[in-house]
Amino acid sequence: LGRTRRPPIFPTEQAYPMRILELKAMRGPNSWSVRRHHLIVMRLDIEDLEQRPTDKIPGFYERITTMLPTMVSHRCSEDHEGGFWSRVKRGTWMGHVIEHIALEIQTLAGMETGFGRTRSTREKGVYNVVFSYVEEPVGLFAAKSAVRIAQALIDGTPYDLEADIQQMRELREESRLGPSTASIVHEAVGRGIPYLRLNGQSLVQLGHGVHQKRIRATITSKTSNIGVEIACDKEETKQLLESYEIPVPKGRVVRTEEGLKDALTVVGYPCVIKPIGGNHGRGATIG
């Protein structure tokens, strides 16, 4: 039996919009690469585009070379400058194109990346698109953005590329390590020591297994300071316990009225609102 198809979003376009089936970030040695620890893995259904490689989409080559001219530096399997353009002109599948777009827009946002792989799966039209990232939130955003960009190029509709690039720059500033922590991590990488960020701030694990050490900014795990700071932060404590499959209440950090509405759709009622740094029930509202 064939898959049930949805009505097209763009009535004049024969292909159905692509769908991201799964999206995750690798943070250590993985099945795609032992050496490259920071990879985005996207399971992508290209729908009817399986029957329409790039050479079968009128105007696609001209549109992508106009929107992303710097991709001329992508060698791909051709091993020469402009190699990827040659692949697009001869005909390649959309998962492969999205891989290269995701890498390029990260580069345009100031984060040099270069590793990518696209592999078919046992399900027709479904691909695993894998590419490297520098900052995890940026990599996840780049995956979604690359799919949107590719769809716009297929449909021949305008797309504000600069807005996405600016948002990636902002995400990088929000998530990047501070100068002291970044210096330690950079030195560890230079010595072949893998690292893993354990939260959105400066808590970092160096090494794996029995040899692992942890730092928070410039404080090491040889003191109890890290544990004390985590215990004083409700959200961070909850995230840490949850990562070890310890049951914790659903919760979100809220800073705006819109954020509160979004959080309530996840948490539901009844709920408790309390200061993130409060104690003894001070400032708590129940309802």
Model-derived segments and spans:
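Long, compositionally biased, glycine/small-hydrophobic-enriched stretches that function as flexible linkers
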Residues: P11-D164, L171-E173
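Active-site nucleotide/adenylate-binding loops and adjacent lid/helix of ATP-dependent enzymes
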Residues: F60-Y61, V189, K213-G287
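Hydrophobic alpha-helical hairpins/lids featuring a short glycine-rich hinge
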Residues: E174-L177, V185
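Structured, non-catalytic alpha/beta "coupling" segments that mediate domain-domain communication
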Residues: S183-L203
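Extracytoplasmic/secretory soluble proteins
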Residues: L203-L206, N225
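Glycine-rich loop at the start of a catalytic domain that most often binds anionic cofactors/ligands
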Residues: G207-K213
